[in-house]
Amino acid sequence: RRLRFYNSGTIDDLECVIQHAVKTESYKEIVLTGFSMGGNLSLLYLGNKGSQVDSKIGRSVVFSAPCDLKASTQELAKFKNKIYMKRFLVALHQKIRAKMKLMPGQINDDDYHLIKNFKDYDDRYTAPLHGFKSAEDYWDKCSSNRFIPEIKIPTLIVNARNDPFIADGCYPVRETSDSKCVYLEMPESGGHVGFIQFKKDKSYWSEERAIEFLKS
C-alpha cells in the first residue's frame, strides 16, 4: 500500500506492465496505444526511453493527448469546461476517500471543497505525494511535448482541433516537424476521445485510423 496515485508521469508503472508482457507472453510485437492522459504517458515513456526502448515495441498511436499539461489544465479551468472540471474533481475526491480508508491518518480531505481546479488539486495532492515541488513542477516534468523529439519508433499523434480539453501547447507542431518517427494529425473534429462516425458496424474513426497506421 502506497500513498501515490496514477498520474501523468507514472512511466514506471507502464514500464512494469511492458516488461511483464515481454517476459511472460510470446508477443511478436507490442504496440502502445494511449488515449487522453494515457496518450501523454505513452509519449513521455517513449521519449524518455529513446533508442533504449524495448525492441518488441514496434509502433505507437495516441489520441487526444494533453502534451502540455499546464496548457491543458488552464483550458479545463475555463468557465466553458466547468461541468467537466466538477466531474473530474468529484471522481478524484472518491479516490482520496478510498485511500483514506486504506491508510487512515496518512491523507485527508479536509476543506476539499476549496479545490476548484487541477492546479489546486495538484498542488495539494499530486505534487507532494509524488516528489514534485509544486503543480508547476509536476506539469513541466511530466508534459510529453519536450520529449517527443527523442521518440525513435513510428508514432502517430491525433489531436482534434475542437478538443475542449487541450490548448495550443498540446498540438506539438514544432516538436514533430523535424522528426522522422513522429507524425501529427489535427482533424477538424473528434472532440476529446470522440472521433465518432455513424456506421452500421458502430466503429470509431479513431479505431480505423489506428489500424491503418499500424498496417502501413
What are the residue ranges of the model-derived segments?
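Glycine-rich "HGGG/HGxG" loop immediately N-terminal to the catalytic nucleophile
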Residues: 1-5, 196
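Alpha/beta-hydrolase-fold enzymes
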Residues: 25, 29-129
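Acidic beta-to-alpha connecting loop that harbors the catalytic carboxylate
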Residues: 145, 161-164, 189-191
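Catalytic histidine neighborhood in serine/cysteine hydrolases
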Residues: 177-193
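Active-site nucleophile elbow and catalytic-triad environment of alpha/beta-hydrolase enzymes
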Residues: 124-147
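Alpha/beta-hydrolase active-site loop
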Residues: 4-25, 44
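Catalytic histidine-centered segment of alpha/beta-hydrolase-like enzymes
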Residues: 190-204
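Short beta-strand/loop motif that positions the catalytic acidic residue
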Residues: 151, 157-159, 163
